[in-house]
Amino acid sequence: MALKYFNNRQLGILGDALDIAEDMTSNYFKLSVSQWKQHPFDVKTLSNSFGEDIKDNAFALLKKYMTVNKVEIEPLYKRREYYIICLQDHQILQALQRDRDLKLLPLLAYILTHELVHIVRFCKFQVRFETQKENSRTKEEKIVYQTTYEILRELSLPNLPYILGSYSPDRMNVDICRFD
C-alpha cells in the first residue's frame, strides 16, 4: 500500500496547528520567547522521512539529537540537545478517513501539543528521554496526556473535545508518540 502524504492545503493547516501548539504550550509552562528557544525542535512530515522514521503504530515519532561539536570552535559544554517531531502523515490521514468526527486542525494541534509537552519535560529534566521500560513509558504517556488535556481543554476548536476524549492512554489503539 502506498503511503499518503499531506498535500499543500494540509501543510498550511499543519502550520496553523503548530502555532496553536507552541502558543498554548508556552503559556501553560509560562515560557518566555528566550526560554522557548532553549527547547529547540523541528517538525518534519512523511515527505522528508525515510526508513526508520516511518512508523505504522504512531501519529508521530520524537527523535533526539545533539548539535555537532566542532572541537576547535565550540567547547563540549556548548553542545545542545534538539528534537525532531516526525509526523506520520499516513497514520494521521488514515485516522481522519476512519473517523469522520476527527478534523485535521484539532488533531494536529493535539498531536503537536502532546509532543511539545514531552520536549519541555525532557528539557526540564522531569523525565529522561531514554526511558525504555514499558511501565515507565506508559506512566509518562499518562502524565503527558493529562498535561496535554489541561493545556487544550479551554481552547475553542471544533471537534477538539471529541479528540481529547478519544485519545486518552486507556482508550488508544494507536500511540500518539514513539521515541527513537
Please report, for each region that a protein language model flagged, where it lies by residue:
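Post-HEXXH active-site segment of zinc metalloproteases
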Residues: L93, L102-Y110, R121-E150
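Peripheral peptide segments
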Residues: L3, S34, E130-N135, Y162-D170
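A metal-dependent hydrolase signature that marks the N-terminal structural subdomain at the beginning
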Residues: M1-K78
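Long, hydrophobic, amphipathic alpha-helical segments used as structural scaffolds
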Residues: F29, V120-K124, L155-N159
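Active-site-adjacent loop/helix micro-motif of nuclease/hydrolase catalytic cores
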Residues: I54-K55, A95-R100
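Long, well-structured alpha-helical subdomains associated
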Residues: N8, G12-D19, Y149, R153-D180
